[in-house]
Amino acid sequence: MRIGHGFDVHAFGGTGPIILGGVRIPYEQGLLAHSDGDVALHALTDALLGAAALGDIGKLFPDTDPAFKGADSRELLREAWRRIQAKGYTLGNVDVTIIAQAPKMAPHIPQMRVFIAEDLGCHMDQVNVKATTTEKLGFTGRGEGIACEAVALLMKAGA
């Protein structure tokens, strides 16, 4: 078994909506990013890549490459997952924690889980997404942006 951890953060800026877990969430501000700014999928992709010892999302999809400008993070996740599977890994489970004062995430979490399960070709019971605040403390608590942490468990196929 291999465990990976991922983290991402983006500042608010511009106009909404924001995209988290592949879900478009209405909000007055967007997230500043080279791609679509989906911190949930970026953290998850990093966790998966880390567990497989394949580096990180910035190595695979550099923000200096114009090809990834405005990129759909679901596509990035699917490509990373293809590479991980090519190394002989299967998914145990993933757990994603979104850290934001606003907007409220609860109404959107079920669809995030659906999208992640679709993108990883796994069962819903292998995907958990939750959200928390920092009780108005720090960067996210002041409403300056959104952060996310994710962990992933991989297993060698047939092991």
Curated annotation (Swiss-Prot):
Pathway: Isoprenoid biosynthesis; isopentenyl diphosphate biosynthesis via DXP pathway; isopentenyl diphosphate from 1-deoxy-D-xylulose 5-phosphate: step 4/6. Binds 1 divalent metal cation per subunit. It comes from the Bacteria. Signal peptide: none annotated. The record marks 34, 133 as: Transition state stabilizer. Its cofactor is a divalent metal cation. The keyword Membrane does not apply. GO terms for biological process: isopentenyl diphosphate biosynthetic process, methylerythritol 4-phosphate pathway; terpenoid biosynthetic process. Its EC number is 4.6.1.12. It catalyses: 4-CDP-2-C-methyl-D-erythritol 2-phosphate = 2-C-methyl-D-erythritol 2,4-cyclic diphosphate + CMP. A divalent metal cation binds at residues 8, 10, 42. Keywords: Isoprene biosynthesis, Lyase, Metal-binding. 4-CDP-2-C-methyl-D-erythritol 2-phosphate binds at residues 8-10, 34-35, 56-58, 61-65, 100-106, 132-135, 139, 142. GO terms for molecular function: 2-C-methyl-D-erythritol 2,4-cyclodiphosphate synthase activity; metal ion binding. It is an enzyme of class 4 (lyase). PANTHER family: 2-C-METHYL-D-ERYTHRITOL 2,4-CYCLODIPHOSPHATE SYNTHASE, CHLOROPLASTIC (PTHR43181:SF1). Belongs to the IspF family. Homotrimer. Involved in the biosynthesis of isopentenyl diphosphate (IPP) and dimethylallyl diphosphate (DMAPP), two major building blocks of isoprenoid compounds. Catalyzes the conversion of 4-diphosphocytidyl-2-C-methyl-D-erythritol 2-phosphate (CDP-ME2P) to 2-C-methyl-D-erythritol 2,4-cyclodiphosphate (ME-CPP) with a corresponding release of cytidine 5-monophosphate (CMP). This is 2-C-methyl-D-erythritol 2,4-cyclodiphosphate synthase. It comes from Cronobacter sakazakii (strain ATCC BAA-894) (Enterobacter sakazakii).
